């Protein structure tokens, strides 16, 4: 039995119209994956912003220093994660749009180009990773990362 192109395998409609793109399982999976990554990044960004505020404005110097340590540790991680995932997400969006994703009509190709450069800005992610591993993780004899791991568990 042939199915009409543009109809999902689980389509209930018998008429000739195509289904919405979200009805296709692979597209739905891709969109939900993109959404979950973005929401996770947003939550991490809010947490890091809160730690930045604490590091600048808290009355207690010990708490202020701990927050500053977390910001110092997590900034290169967040930069690398957000820029790498941004490139992946826009690439996936281009895939979802199919051939239209490569045309200027939809704007996805411009977003992809704009996002592809971000891992290079402000120091490439590989240079940031070297700085993280060889300088920030061993800073204060590794106490910062130990503290961070213990609050995360």
Where are these regions (language model features)?
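Flavin-dependent oxidoreductase catalytic core characteristic
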Residues: 1-153
